[in-house]
Amino acid sequence: MSNNAAYAVTPVKTTSTSSRTTFHFAAGLCSGLTSSILLQPADLLKTRVQQSQKTASLLPTIKTILSSPHPIRGLWRGTLPSALRTGFGSALYFTSLNALRQGLAQTEASMAIAASSSDGKSRTSSSALPKLSNWGNLATGAVARTAAGFVMMPVTVLKVRYESDYYAYRSLYSAGRDIVRTEGVRGLFSGFGATAARDAPYAGLYVLFYEQLKRRLASVASSEQSEQPLKSTSSSSINFVSGGLAAGLATAITNPFDAVKTRLQLMPGKYGNMIRAVRLMIREDGVRSLFGGLGLRITRKALSSALAWTVYEELILRAEAHWAEKDKIDL
């Protein structure tokens, strides 16, 4: 089966094979683990820059880590909680996102049919997801991310505390035990309000920008290929570029929430809640503190989102092509 044939799938999926929950979970887990492990140094540096009450500079932070006895280990400090959070968080996110999009696609059936019929038999889209309206993309992204974020919140708190040099935790177990002992179980959910306020608009905007960019880039690529079905390499390139650009835009808009979230998770006793945290940060460190780590976060988010979504969509497209071929043989 050729690559072109393998990708000749319609944008709207209504068969049972297109919503196999287990595979969406596995594909999300694989994509999340890949991006989190490769990009852990950028995430650690972002946490170190944002933790400072006097916004730290990137270069001195890097020099401090590299001058330590174990610089490589230092750059990948916190990889385990980060991989757990991002891996399983991505698995939950993509699984719930697929379920939400499949359900919402049924209510937008007329739009989906029109889009499908206009595409004909060739696939001129790089997407493995059902086509939705802009509001559909915004809503499903926001809801799926908030739900996954709540489930993974304790791991997120452990990750931030362990990456930070504000605490001297020797292991994840000691970190969790100390948090529960001193702050109670609610300490494991410190900063959830700021996290949800960051993740809901970020994820919604990301999916909106991502789908729009893919549509436009696929249209350009299709015209250059004389309306031939998109090749596998073209689809992957479109998804990667779209993922990076969408993440950069969404990250720049939502970075203040990320900065507030980091302070709340590191020093909940001092900052208390989102409103108090914003006031204290601006009063003590200036408005620039709300954009601490922006460059690092954009870099990491652009790369991680591009990697995660490209890997996820590639796995789903190949799996659905395999299932479709298997169904034909069974018939």
Swiss-Prot record:
GO terms for molecular function: glycine transmembrane transporter activity. Solcar repeats lie at residues 19-103, 132-216, 234-318. Gene3D superfamilies: Mitochondrial carrier domain (1.50.40.10). It is a multi-pass membrane protein. InterPro entries: Hem25/SLC25A38, Mitochondrial_sb/sol_carrier, Mt_carrier_dom_sf. GO terms for cellular component: mitochondrial inner membrane. It comes from the Eukaryota. The chain crosses the membrane at residues 25-50, 78-104, 138-163, 191-214, 238-264, 293-311. The keyword Zinc does not apply. Its main location: mitochondrion. Pfam families: Mito_carr. Keywords: Membrane, Mitochondrion, Mitochondrion inner membrane, Repeat, Transmembrane, Transmembrane helix, Transport. Mitochondrial glycine transporter that imports glycine into the mitochondrial matrix. Plays an important role in providing glycine for the first enzymatic step in heme biosynthesis, the condensation of glycine with succinyl-CoA to produce 5-aminolevulinate (ALA) in the mitochondrial matrix. Belongs to the mitochondrial carrier (TC 2.A.29) family. SLC25A38 subfamily. This is Mitochondrial glycine transporter.
